[in-house]
C-alpha cells in the first residue's frame, strides 16, 4: 500500500488529472447509476469557490500593504491586453461566422426565470454597483469586483499599520494559500467525479444535433488560444510563445475546462503564476481581475450565436455593422461576470442591434444552454488560461525593457 501511495505522490498533478478523466469517462459509460459519486465533484468545486474570495482578499491586501514606492506591477499593460484580447476574440468570431454561416432550429424551450439586461449601460451599471458592495457580502457571494475594491482599500489603509499587523496579514495570506494547495491536490478526484456526472447525465451522443454549432464555437476558441493569443505574445515579447501558451492551457485551462468556473480556477491560476516565478504584487491583482473582465471566450459565444440568429432570420449585415457587433460583444463580455447566466444572457443585447425581438433572442439563448456543456467548458478554459498568459507576457516585457 505504501508503494502505491509513494508512486501516486511522485506522479505529477496533470497526469493524475488525466487518469481521473479516463476513469470518470469509463464510469460514466459503464456505471451511470452511481449518482452518489457526483457529490465529490460538487465538493471539489464548492471548496475552490469558497476559498477563492478569501484568497483574493488576503493576497491583494497583503501585497498592497507591503508594496514599496516605485515598485512596478505592469497592471496597465495587463488591462490593455485583457481588453484587446477580448476584442480580438470577438473579431475572429465575426470572421468565423462569415466563413461558416450557421442556421439555428429555434424550437427550444426558453428559461423564463432568467431576464437579460436591457443594454450595455445596464451591464456596466451592475458592474459599478458591485464596486461598493458590502465587503462581507462581496466575500460571501464571490463578487470579485467588490472583493478587489475592498482589498485595495484595506491594503492602502494597512500601509500605515505596525509591522506586527502587517506580519499577521502576511501569515493569513500564507495560511490561505496553503489551504488552496490542499484543495488543488484533490483535483484528480474532483475532476473524475465532474467528468462522470457530465457523461452519466448527458450521454456521449446527446449533442450530435448541434455538432456543427459546437464545432464552430470550439474551433474558434481553439484558434484564438493557439493562433491569436500566441501572436499577441510574440508582438509583446519577441520570442517563441508556445511553451508558455501550452503550459497555461495544460495547467490552467485543463482544470478550468472541468470546473467550468473562472472563480473556482483563481487559486489554480495563482499557484501557476507562483510556479512560473511571476511577481505576487502583480498576479494577486491581475488574476482575479482577469476572471472578471478578460472574457475572450464569452465574446466568441456572443458573436457566433448572434450572427447565427442573424443568418437564420435572413437579416443582411455589412462589415461596419459586424465591426460594431465586435465592439458591443467585447464590451458586454467584460461585464459577463456581473450577469446571472453569464455570456449567454448577453446575447439579447447583441441581437438588439439587428432588431431581433427579445422572445426570439431568448430562443437563441435556449440553444446556447443546450450546447453549454461543451461551450461553457471551452469558454472558461480559454478565459482562465489567458489570464495567466497575459500576466506572464506583461511581466516578461517589463524585464526585457529594464535590461535594454
From Swiss-Prot:
Which residue ranges traverse the bilayer? 17-37, 39-59, 75-95, 138-158, 179-199, 212-232, 287-307, 313-333
Indicate the principal place this protein occupies in or around the cell: membrane
Q: How does it sit in the membrane?
A: Multi-pass membrane protein
Keywords, sorted A to Z = Amino-acid transport, Cell membrane, Membrane, Symport, Transmembrane, Transmembrane helix, Transport
| Superkingdom classification of source | Bacteria
Q: Which GO terms describe its molecular function?
A: amino acid transmembrane transporter activity; symporter activity
The reaction(s) catalysed by this protein are: L-serine(in) + Na(+)(in) = L-serine(out) + Na(+)(out); L-threonine(in) + Na(+)(in) = L-threonine(out) + Na(+)(out)
Give a GO biological-process term: threonine transport
- Do you know which Pfam families this protein is assigned to? SDF
Q: Which SUPFAM superfamilies match?
A: Proton glutamate symport protein
Q: What is its subcellular localisation?
A: Cell membrane
GO cellular component labels: plasma membrane
Q: Give the InterPro entries listed for this entry.
A: Na-dicarboxylate_symporter, Na:dicarbo_symporter_sf, Ser_Thr_transp_SstT
Which family does the record claim for this protein? Belongs to the dicarboxylate/amino acid:cation symporter (DAACS) (TC 2.A.23) family.
| HAMAP family, alphabetized | Ser_Thr_transp_SstT
Task: Tell me, in a sentence or two, what this protein's role is.
Answer: Involved in the import of serine and threonine into the cell, with the concomitant import of sodium (symport system).
Identify this protein by name.
Answer: Serine/threonine transporter SstT
Amino acid at each position: 500500500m505504501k508503494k502505491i501511495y509513494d508512486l501516486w505522490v511522485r506522479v505529477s498533478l496533470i497526469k493524475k488529472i488525466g487518469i481521473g478523466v479516463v476513469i470518470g469517462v469509463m464510469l460514466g459509460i459503464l456505471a451511470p447509476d452511481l449518482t452518489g459519486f457526483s457529490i465529490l465533484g460538487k465538493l471539489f468545486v464548492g471548496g475552490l469557490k469558497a476559498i477563492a474570495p478569501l484568497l483574493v482578499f488576503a493576497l491583494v491586501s497583503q501585497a498592497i500593504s507591503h508594496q514599496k514606492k516605485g515598485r512596478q506591477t505592469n497592471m496597465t499593460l495587463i488591462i490593455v491586453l485583457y481588453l484587446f484580447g477580448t476584442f480580438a476574440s470577438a473579431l475572429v468570431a465575426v470572421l468565423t461566422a462569415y466563413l461558416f454561416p450557421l442556421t439555428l432550429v429555434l424550437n427550444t424551450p426558453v428559461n423564463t426565470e432568467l431576464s437579460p439586461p436591457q443594454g450595455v449601460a445596464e451591464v456596466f451599471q451592475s458592474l459599478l454597483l458591485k464596486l461598493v458592495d458590502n465587503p462581507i457580502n462581496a466575500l460571501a457571494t464571490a463578487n470579485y469586483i467588490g472583493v478587489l475594491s475592498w482589498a485595495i482599500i484595506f491594503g492602502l489603509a494597512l500601509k500605515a499599520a505596525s509591522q506586527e499587523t502587517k506580519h499577521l496579514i502576511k501569515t493569513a495570506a500564507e495560511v490561505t494559500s496553503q489551504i488552496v494547495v490542499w484543495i488543488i491536490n484533490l483535483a484528480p478526484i474532483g475532476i473524475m467525479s465532474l467528468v462522470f456526472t457530465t457523461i452519466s447525465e448527458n450521454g456521449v451522443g446527446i449533442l450530435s444535433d448541434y455538432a456543427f454549432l459546437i464545432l464552430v464555437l470550439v474551433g474558434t476558441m481553439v484558434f484564438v488560444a493557439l493562433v491569436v493569443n500566441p501572436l499577441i505574445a510574440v508582438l509583446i515579447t519577441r520570442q517563441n510563445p508556445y511553451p508558455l501558451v501550452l503550459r497555461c492551457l495544460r495547467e490552467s485551462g485543463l482544470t478550468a475546462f472541468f470546473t467550468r468556473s473562472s472563480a473556482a480556477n483563481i487559486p489554480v491560476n495563482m499557484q501557476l503564476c507562483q510556479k512560473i516565478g511571476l511577481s505576487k504584487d502583480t498576479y494577486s491583482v491581475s488574476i482575479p481581475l482577469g476572471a472578471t473582465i478578460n472574457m475572450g471566450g464569452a465574446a466568441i459565444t456572443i458573436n457566433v450565436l448572434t450572427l447565427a440568429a442573424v443568418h437564420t432570420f435572413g437579416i443582411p449585415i455589412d462589415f461596419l455593422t459586424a465591426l460594431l457587433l465586435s465592439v458591443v460583444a467585447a464590451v458586454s463580455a467584460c461585464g459577463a461576470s456581473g450577469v446571472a447566466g453569464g455570456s449567454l444572457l448577453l446575447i439579447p443585447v447583441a441581437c438588439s442591434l439587428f432588431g431581433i425581438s427579445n422572445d426570439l433572442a431568448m430562443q437563441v439563448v435556449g440553444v446556447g444552454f443546450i450546447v453549454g456543456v461543451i461551450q461553457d467548458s471551452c469558454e472558461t478554459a480559454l478565459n482562465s488560461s489567458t489570464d495567466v498568459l497575459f500576466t506572464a507576457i506583461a511581466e516578461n516585457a517589463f524585464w526585457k525593457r529594464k535590461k535594454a
